[in-house]
């Protein structure tokens, strides 16, 4: 029977084969006509790559069927070298977890009266519960950047 082999260049060659012929035999016939070594040939039929040990009848290749010839690609992707950094990686700042942190902001005296130790930010943007940091010369809100400066250090 006669089959067609279409190469990458678009050229179509005809081969005389039998249904019992193996794929290896077909590749050898292509080598005789085109000069491409069988180890570099890949034959595709109906979207499947044909394996060397099987026959044409295994793949249901009938007379006047067209096989597509593509060349086997050499190698794979280039191996990349792992980067080595000269300086060590900077550690991220870890926030310290303080148990019962609310106790820093309030004081309970012997009468049971609660007084604030830190000033609460009056800005509408911050809302209730945002306290200002007390520095030696000012009170500062870290959320809205509001700052109150003292005239004298003993004026706290």
Curated annotation (Swiss-Prot):
<dbReference type="Pfam" id="PF01599">
    <property type="entry name" value="Ribosomal_S27"/>
</dbReference>
<dbReference type="GO" id="GO:0031386">
    <property type="term" value="F:protein tag activity"/>
</dbReference>
<keyword id="KW-0862">Zinc</keyword>
<dbReference type="InterPro" id="IPR000626">
    <property type="entry name" value="Ubiquitin-like_dom"/>
</dbReference>
<feature type="cross-link" description="Glycyl lysine isopeptide (Lys-Gly) (interchain with G-Cter in ubiquitin)">
    <location>
        <position position="33"/>
    </location>
</feature>
<protein>
    <recommendedName>
        <fullName>Ubiquitin-ribosomal protein eS31 fusion protein</fullName>
    </recommendedName>
</protein>
<dbReference type="InterPro" id="IPR011332">
    <property type="entry name" value="Ribosomal_zn-bd"/>
</dbReference>
<dbReference type="InterPro" id="IPR038582">
    <property type="entry name" value="Ribosomal_eS31_euk-type_sf"/>
</dbReference>
<dbReference type="GO" id="GO:0003735">
    <property type="term" value="F:structural constituent of ribosome"/>
</dbReference>
<feature type="cross-link" description="Glycyl lysine isopeptide (Lys-Gly) (interchain with G-Cter in ubiquitin)">
    <location>
        <position position="6"/>
    </location>
</feature>
<dbReference type="GO" id="GO:0005634">
    <property type="term" value="C:nucleus"/>
</dbReference>
<feature type="cross-link" description="Glycyl lysine isopeptide (Lys-Gly) (interchain with G-Cter in ubiquitin)">
    <location>
        <position position="29"/>
    </location>
</feature>
<feature type="cross-link" description="Glycyl lysine isopeptide (Lys-Gly) (interchain with G-Cter in ubiquitin)">
    <location>
        <position position="63"/>
    </location>
</feature>
<feature type="cross-link" description="Glycyl lysine isopeptide (Lys-Gly) (interchain with G-Cter in ubiquitin)">
    <location>
        <position position="48"/>
    </location>
</feature>
<keyword id="KW-0832">Ubl conjugation</keyword>
<feature type="site" description="Essential for function">
    <location>
        <position position="68"/>
    </location>
</feature>
<feature type="cross-link" description="Glycyl lysine isopeptide (Lys-Gly) (interchain with G-Cter in ubiquitin)">
    <location>
        <position position="11"/>
    </location>
</feature>
<feature type="zinc finger region" description="C4-type">
    <location>
        <begin position="121"/>
        <end position="144"/>
    </location>
</feature>
<feature type="site" description="Interacts with activating enzyme">
    <location>
        <position position="54"/>
    </location>
</feature>
<dbReference type="InterPro" id="IPR050158">
    <property type="entry name" value="Ubiquitin_ubiquitin-like"/>
</dbReference>
<feature type="site" description="Interacts with activating enzyme">
    <location>
        <position position="72"/>
    </location>
</feature>
<dbReference type="Pfam" id="PF00240">
    <property type="entry name" value="ubiquitin"/>
</dbReference>
<keyword id="KW-0863">Zinc-finger</keyword>
<dbReference type="GO" id="GO:0005737">
    <property type="term" value="C:cytoplasm"/>
</dbReference>
<keyword id="KW-0539">Nucleus</keyword>
<dbReference type="GO" id="GO:0005730">
    <property type="term" value="C:nucleolus"/>
</dbReference>
<keyword id="KW-1017">Isopeptide bond</keyword>
<dbReference type="InterPro" id="IPR002906">
    <property type="entry name" value="Ribosomal_eS31"/>
</dbReference>
<feature type="domain" description="Ubiquitin-like">
    <location>
        <begin position="1"/>
        <end position="76"/>
    </location>
</feature>
<dbReference type="GO" id="GO:0032040">
    <property type="term" value="C:small-subunit processome"/>
</dbReference>
<keyword id="KW-0687">Ribonucleoprotein</keyword>
<keyword id="KW-0479">Metal-binding</keyword>
<dbReference type="InterPro" id="IPR019956">
    <property type="entry name" value="Ubiquitin_dom"/>
</dbReference>
<feature type="cross-link" description="Glycyl lysine isopeptide (Gly-Lys) (interchain with K-? in acceptor proteins)">
    <location>
        <position position="76"/>
    </location>
</feature>
<feature type="region of interest" description="Disordered">
    <location>
        <begin position="76"/>
        <end position="95"/>
    </location>
</feature>
<dbReference type="GO" id="GO:0006412">
    <property type="term" value="P:translation"/>
</dbReference>
<dbReference type="GO" id="GO:0042274">
    <property type="term" value="P:ribosomal small subunit biogenesis"/>
</dbReference>
<comment type="similarity">
    <text>In the N-terminal section; belongs to the ubiquitin family.</text>
</comment>
<dbReference type="GO" id="GO:0005654">
    <property type="term" value="C:nucleoplasm"/>
</dbReference>
<dbReference type="GO" id="GO:0008270">
    <property type="term" value="F:zinc ion binding"/>
</dbReference>
<comment type="similarity">
    <text>In the C-terminal section; belongs to the eukaryotic ribosomal protein eS31 family.</text>
</comment>
<dbReference type="InterPro" id="IPR029071">
    <property type="entry name" value="Ubiquitin-like_domsf"/>
</dbReference>
